[in-house]
Amino acid sequence: MRMDEYLRTVTEQVRCSRMHDSIAEELKDHILDQAEAFEEEGTDHEQALELAVREMGDPVETGVALDRIHRPHMSVEMLVLVSLISVLSLVFYGSMLVFAEDASINGMEYWFQQQVKYTMTGFLLMLLVCRIDYSVLGKWSRQIAGGILLFILLSLVTGVQVYGRIYGLRVGPVMIPTFGMIWLYVPAYAAVLYTYRGRSYKGLTGLLIWTLLPVFLVLRLPGLNQAVMLLFICLLLFSIAVGKGWYQVSPRKMLAAVWGMMILAPAMMLGTGMLAEYQVKRLQAWLGYGEPSYAAQTAYECLRTSRLLGASGNHVWQKLPGWNSEYILVSLTSAYGLLAAVTAVTLLLLLWVKMFHISSHQKNQLGMMVGYGCSMVLLAQSGLVLVMNLGLLPSAAITIPFFSAGGSNMVSSYILTGLVLSIYRYKDILPGNPVKRMHPASAE
């Protein structure tokens, strides 16, 4: 069999057409190397090629074996975890209808219906995003990130306000929540970092805009907690990129400057008058000043009287502000017992570990960084809500993925999860792109 016939037969067995060229090229190189070895033993060129092809084995069997490798995959473990978390969330809100006795209390029936609607919508979006090739983020990273920043800016100018805070931007009959879009900026930012590979100090100045502009815009919404979290995640992603040798800079000097800026950021915000008076007080509370709020004291009292298993009798939906958002874990504990909250946190932790494992084992550098970004968002939200529910941080408007009420929180969490599923799905299809470690340079 001729080499071109062999390669054609092999690639015909592989259903993923985008892999045909790379598979054919790899097999061709192997055949030519083997043929060269036969020629060194005295065999003429044509016969050497024929022998090399014959040693490759049956082309159909080879193609079928390669098809099993180079095809989209689904992370069943991750899908099961998300499904369990979604079901647990719906069970919790459904049970509140029973515990509340009167479904009209605090709009209990409304919250249950909203949770069902957004859980189903988010789950379907997750499956849709999973099927989309995540590499489009690398190709259109700046356009996507710029579009999200433009959306936030338009929200500031023409957005709908609720209690003095920008809620969302109305596009025709549809209201698009602004705060959900903030977290979708993170994977786009990770892709922007990828496009700056090989740059030196001068070439990286543009990254300052991509890093600080969204933080400034979020502060104006206003969203102090979200701005601090966003800045921390972006700097952490940038630090990973520096540590991986993506840029022609001194890692020590660059990381010292980056984290020095992070440490000085609160002082700069306080000193420049960027923050409103209530934001200053909130930042001071986070730094350890001030008395615990009513919500924090109520949450502590609910936890103190909770049981290991079973309802405590505390009607948290009546007396705890944020019972279905930032204090959702306290509500779970009051309704079902401490084990229920531990189960929820454990499932979220397992999901994050799985997401981080998928990201860290990517040969494709873009997939690795985007996966890290998605994982960090879910970890930061879950971790802050956990420590806040334990009384270790003051009360703040932070939501926990999949559980806290609100369509923007639900949908953004599912989309970020879908991106990680997409990274896993295409792990054996998109080529790896190892980055050579850069050395510091004075100019680009």
Annotated model-derived regions:
Residues 1-79, 83:
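Soluble N-terminal domains of membrane-associated systems
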Residues 117-125, 334-355:
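Hydrophobic alpha-helical transmembrane segments
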Residues 110-137, 184-198, 236-246, 353-354:
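Transmembrane alpha-helical segments and their membrane-water interfaces
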Residues 50-163, 343, 375, 410-439, ...:
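A structural signal for hydrophobic alpha-helical transmembrane segments in multi-pass membrane proteins
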Residues 205-214, 225-271:
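Hydrophobic alpha-helical segments of polytopic membrane proteins
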Residues 250-343:
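Hydrophobic, glycine- and aromatic-enriched re-entrant/interface helices and adjoining loop segments
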Residues 358-397, 403:
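Loop-to-helix entry and N-terminal half of a specific, functionally important transmembrane alpha helix
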Residues 154-176, 277-285:
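Membrane-interfacial helix-loop-helix modules of multi-pass inner-membrane proteins that assemble, modify
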